[in-house]
């Protein structure tokens, strides 16, 4: 496991000693009304392609989750503790995939004070909304409600680096003020600043809102402006219209500056596209009780010129136990393009066992390794064993630009525990 991550979790040189926090707060757990726990173990055999060489490796992953709710402490409402963590072992060294490592994704305590006027969250958490986008943070987050309609939130702490993310800085703080004039409507103004050492890594302001214009018409919009760069980092607007009970149409537009999603201190921002704009719309139509259709088209404006993106999906319920689907996605920009087609089917043998299969083919405009596409088929079986246990076995076989033949095998077993039936339901 990464030593920096372990040090941060255990409090060795850390400003947020999460492990110490957990040990202090664990005492009230015995009085908790509801405890939910999950454990998932996965084994995966798959190939790895690196510098023209192919080798097979085995990855073992363990994911655990714990939710402790309704902890009874005088003066505190909705007190709960949440934990989500994972660990992984790999048979390959220097793998291009995630190797032998692990981390804590979430570990926080949360509660409400003063008749729910103040809510506090302390520990490793996800801060979302407004200029924060989605920020994983070791710190504190609070929301103060002045009335049912108006409130402010503020947070501060150390941003963390998790799977599939990059370091964004060493200290972050920000907040959001919001107004909820009616059910389904909310507008907000927000701010975020991230510091890396003594250098400014990000400084953004944001506005966002959703509005129920009519009972069947709603609109959402958001925008984030980089103060340092004096440019819009991200903006979007979407209009939804429920024309009929079974028909919804929508239109949307967006502007993205990918380089502003990276820290201002990152050298990779030089290589990122400057702008990406899109506009289009689509629909979802439940044609019959057995068939549904989703269509979407976007016109693209990118640095190199114009492009098009389209998505079509249909789901058909063949019988009470069988369902099939067809999907197609097309993306074309001036210098590249991809066409992706997928078909899948799912069938329930009984209440506990479900079988599924799919085949996916991709056609590339520009060949990779002298190969113009890929095709991969997958078959899987899931089994709800009972008493909280479940299992899955899945295998894939196909050819990709990186492998003449690619085969993967995945096995998973999971366990879920909850005392909600005994305590939560009775209460």
Where are these regions (language model features)?
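N-terminal secretory signal peptides that target proteins for export/translocation
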Residues: 1-14
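Enrichment for repetitive, rod-forming helical segments
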Residues: 10, 22-23, 131
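Intrinsically disordered, low-complexity Ser/Thr/Pro-rich tracts
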Residues: 12-17, 346
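Bacterial N-terminal signal peptides
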Residues: 17-28
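Gram-negative and organellar
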Residues: 32-427
């Amino acid at each position: 496991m990464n030593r920096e991550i372990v040090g941060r979790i255990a409090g060795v040189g850390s400003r947020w000693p999460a492990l110490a926090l957990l040990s202090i707060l664990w005492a009230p757990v015995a009085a908790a009304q509801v405890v939910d726990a999950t454990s998932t173990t996965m084994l995966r055999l798959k190939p790895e392609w690196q510098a023209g060489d192919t080798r097979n490796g085995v990855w073992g992953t363990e994911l655990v989750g714990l939710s402790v709710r309704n902890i009874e402490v005088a003066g505190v409402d909705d007190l709960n503790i949440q934990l989500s963590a994972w660990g992984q072992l790999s048979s390959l060294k220097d793998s291009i995939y995630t190797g032998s490592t692990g981390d804590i994704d979430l570990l926080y305590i949360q509660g409400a004070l003063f008749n729910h006027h103040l809510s506090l969250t302390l520990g490793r958490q996800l801060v979302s909304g407004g200029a924060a986008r989605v920020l994983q943070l070791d710190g504190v987050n609070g929301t103060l409600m002045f009335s049912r309609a108006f409130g402010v939130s503020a947070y501060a702490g150390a941003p963390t680096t998790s799977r599939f993310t990059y370091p964004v800085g060493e200290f972050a703080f920000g907040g959001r003020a919001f107004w909820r004039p009616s059910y389904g409507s909310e507008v907000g103004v927000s701010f975020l600043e991230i510091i890396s050492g003594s250098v400014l890594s990000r400084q953004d302001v944001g506005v966002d809102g959703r509005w129920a214009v009519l009972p069947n018409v709603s609109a959402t919009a958001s925008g984030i402006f980089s103060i340092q760069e004096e440019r819009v980092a991200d903006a979007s607007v979407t209009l939804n219209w429920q024309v009929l009970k079974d028909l919804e149409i929508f239109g949307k537009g967006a502007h993205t500056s990918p380089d502003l999603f990276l820290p201002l201190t990152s050298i990779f921002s030089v290589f990122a596209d400057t702008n990406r704009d899109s506009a289009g719309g689509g629909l979802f139509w439940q044609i019959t009780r057995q068939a549904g259709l989703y269509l979407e088209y976007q016109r693209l404006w990118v640095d190199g010129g114009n492009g098009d993106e389209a998505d079509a999906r249909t789901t058909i319920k063949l019988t009470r136990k069988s369902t099939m689907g067809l999907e197609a996605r097309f993306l074309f920009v001036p210098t590249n393009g991809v066409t992706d087609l997928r078909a899948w089917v799912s069938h329930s043998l009984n209440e506990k066992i479900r079988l599924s299969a799919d085949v996916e083919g991709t056609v590339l405009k520009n060949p990779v390794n002298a190969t113009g596409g890929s095709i991969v088929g997958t078959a899987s079986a899931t089994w709800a064993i009972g008493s909280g246990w479940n299992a899955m076995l899945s295998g894939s076989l196909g050819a990709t630009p990186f492998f003449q033949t690619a085969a993967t095998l995945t096995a998973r077993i999971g366990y879920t525990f909850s005392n909600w039936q005994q305590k939560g339901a009775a209460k």
